[in-house]
Amino acid sequence: MRFVHISDNHLGFRQFGLFERENDFYDVFDRAVEEIIKERPDFVIHSGDLFEASRPPTRALLLVQRSFSRLKDENIPIYAIPGNHDTIMRKNTYPPQILYEMFGLKLISKKNPFYVQDGVFIGGSPYISKYYSKSLKERIKFLGERSKDYDKSILVLHQAIDKYLPHEFELKIGDLPKCFDYYALGHIHNRIIDDFGRGRLAYSGSTEIWKIDELKNYKKKGKGFYLVDLDGDIPDVQGVNLEMSREVIEEKIEFSEFEEDIGRLKRYIEEMETMPILYLTVKGDFDRSFVHKKLIDSLSNIS
């Protein structure tokens, strides 16, 4: 039994207000679907934040419709929860994922907290804020009890856990029951795999670089999704890396070496087929307007 664990695509995100960056998030999602079809998993688990917002742009909605239709044609069902970005924080409302039930998506919700596929228990909860953590813990406890009737079980959540995000979390690691074989988590954008209870706990991470603080983890572990094999006593978790649409560069330079370093960066960028994202920090005593103008003059004419 093999499945894909993917999360945090943030489709519709127009980073820096650039349509090129919005396209990058769409393109990498397309590549993810291609790779999933190649892997031929038994099902897909999506751990939230498929979209950047609860009211995604039409293009994002159509892209997901086309992608999930392809997975349905390949007999690959999808089990999904909404995350904090694509959850509508009002009663009696529906997340955008509900549009795709006719395309093979099974929405894990308060109404349908778990499903069973080929003897595997798949249970979870949509994102719940820390202000309602008591309700979240009660749901998790309920799912833990129900899962004990099955040989294999998966818990799907879109929450931060204190062990992995100590300054901003909704759950403590001790709040999780230890009876699941795989904990398919979303919300934290860095890739994480850990031993927990009788199985493995994993954040599959985002599929694109949403913030600069993800760059270090990306360079070390890549971005993409996990391919999980449940057949052994302990799940085997393999990362499938996706190619990014453009390079992300983070540079810190001294103002005293400004001209030399900008020239070096310009030559490096000119060799690229696609314009990168450049995060640049200039250190020293300088006039900000001068540096800004110099950067525009030096780098804006690269083609």
Locate predicted features:
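Domain-start "cap" segments at the beginnings of catalytic or binding domains
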Residues: 1-23, 222-245
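N-terminal active-site segment of His-dependent metallophosphoesterases
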Residues: 1-67, 145-146
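Structural beta-sheet core signal
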Residues: 5, 46, 80, 155, ...
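A short, well-ordered alpha-helical element
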Residues: 30-40, 141-142, 258-272
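His/Asp/Glu-rich metal-coordinating catalytic cores
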Residues: 43, 54-69, 73-213, 221-222, ...
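Conserved residues at the C-terminal ends of beta-strands
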Residues: 47, 186, 281-283
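Gly/Ser/Thr-rich active-site loops/lids in small-molecule metabolic enzymes
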Residues: 209-211, 218-221, 298-303
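Accessory, non-catalytic peripheral segments of nucleic-acid enzymes
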Residues: 232-303
